[in-house]
A protein has these predicted regions:
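Short, exposed beta-strand-loop hairpins at the edges of beta-sheets
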Residues: 122-140
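C-terminal motif of bacterial Sec signal peptides marking the signal peptidase cleavage site
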Residues: 16-18
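A short, Trp-centered hydrophobic/proline-enriched beta-strand micro-motif
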Residues: 37-49
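Bacterial signal peptide processing site
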Residues: 20-23
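A short-motif feature that recognizes glycine-rich, charge-decorated loops
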Residues: 68-108
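Short, surface-exposed binding/anchoring microloops in extracellular/periplasmic proteins
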Residues: 48-67, 71-73
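Bacterial N-terminal signal peptides that target proteins for export
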Residues: 1-8
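Short, surface-exposed coil-to-beta transition loops
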Residues: 54-59, 108, 135-138
Length: 149
């Protein structure tokens, strides 16, 4: 006779593994929308929200051309040098798509993504890697995307 607890755990594991998989179609669809527009030069604001030392620098204004970051400045004019490597890791739309893809693959505890309806880029990404760790959530918020010539 099977124990109810074992059945519950099996069902819970199946449900949780399906959560990440259910987000992959939206990722694929929106990434295709973004890529279909062949946007090579753009500027946007990025706010990274977390319990991090750089919160006063947010949002960043980032300009990207041909996949390369050509400028990145803090909204308050502060020095971003100490955090440059961290910021560069998520400073292109392509890298934000990769971040979502990685979170889905890793089956993080919670992943909430909202995509821009016109361009398809991830406008809001909130990741909570672990249910067991408090205050480890990170949010990435893209605003004011401007396509440049």
């Amino acid at each position: 006779m099977k124990k109810p607890g074992v059945i519950f755990l099996i069902l819970l594991a199946a449900f949780l593994s399906a959560c990440g998989a259910s987000q992959r179609p939206a990722l694929v669809q929106n990434r295709s929308l973004w890529e279909s527009q062949a946007i090579q030069h753009y500027r946007f604001n990025l706010k990274v929200g977390c319990f991090c030392p750089w919160n006063a620098l947010m949002p960043l204004t980032i300009e990207v051309r041909n996949g390369e970051i050509i400028s990145m400045v803090a909204s308050n004019g502060g020095d971003i040098t100490p955090y440059l490597d961290t910021f560069r890791a998520h400073a292109t739309i392509e890298s934000l798509f990769d971040l979502v893809d990685s979170a889905i693959s890793k089956r993080v505890y919670s992943l909430v993504v909202q995509y821009d309806p016109k361009y398809g880029f991830p406008a809001s990404i909130v990741i909570d890697p672990s249910r067991m760790i408090m205050d480890d959530e990170t949010g990435y918020y893209v605003t004011n995307l401007e396509v440049l010539p």
